[in-house]
Amino acid sequence: MSSYTLGIDTSNYATSLAVFDTAGEVVCAKKRFLPVKEGQLGLRQSDALFHHTVALPEMLAELGSEFDLTQISAVGVSEKPRPVKGSYMPCFLAGVSAAEAFALARGIPLIRTTHQQGHAAAALFAAKGEEFFREKTLLFHISGGTTDLLLCDEVKHIETLGTSSDLYAGQAVDRVGVKLGFGFPAGVEVSRLAAECDETIKPKSSVRGMECSLSGLENQCNALLTAGKSPAYVCKYCLLCVADTVVKMTKAAQKEYPGLAVVCAGGVMSSDIIRSWVQQRLPQVYFVPGQYSSDNAIGVSILAAREAGLWLK
């Protein structure tokens, strides 16, 4: 008999809810991006916390109109960005508050996890169902706040193998997009415009082993615009530089951890241009659908099911 779990994630980008059926199906998933004023690169934490506080009751009401929330057997929530000591962002307090209230009112277990583990769980589930929850995998998590190459052991233990020494890939993409007049986050619009460029581009990336530097990418893109290159060209160049970085870091990881599956997740990895470039060079790498790749609560709901003993017993 199926059981159902609720996942809640309140990142600095979006408010997300999801319901997971322990038969192995995502019943529903909802996401609302936080409003960012034109020309700005994100929100202050106090503003993000406010918007989550407003959005959560509305979104839970919407969810309740589509699914009987009295059937929920456990609730999961991301309480901080990463499963490491000192990791903290106030925006996650909104989700924790809502999850605690829901669990207490229903008398059901509350499972605390992290935003990064939620991303990992959603991506691994989308790539190969429960199989990747039983083994070690390499996960590339690239978003506005991460450019991390991770070693995942059943998502219970996550080790960072490599990262950016400065700017994150999502930050570089967003800064290029906002400079071109797009709203924040700008990844979707940057990818759309990049697809209009038919020119062959040779990207430049700065990678040493499993570590990278992306601060130069923003400067390169600004220089290209100043030199008269079209916005479409610059957007494509930016995305291909990220893709080339992924390829080089992945190859370095595969030398050290041969035989492990590689899964790509995070909002930046939703780009068709990045996916195409990477898979032409590393065809065995898994990319997952957008709703499992960008910010979501799907992974949190899945982890709630596992940790509550309702799934993968």
Give the positions of each predicted feature.
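A short helix-loop
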Residues: 3, 10-11, 18, 27-29, ...
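Short, well-ordered amphipathic alpha-helical segments that serve as non-catalytic structural scaffolds
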Residues: 30-32, 51-66, 245-250
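Glycine-rich beta-strand-to-loop/alpha-helix junction loops that act as flexible
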Residues: 77-80, 143-145, 263-271
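Glycine-rich phosphate-binding/hydrolytic loop that grips phosphoryl groups
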Residues: 119-123, 288-313
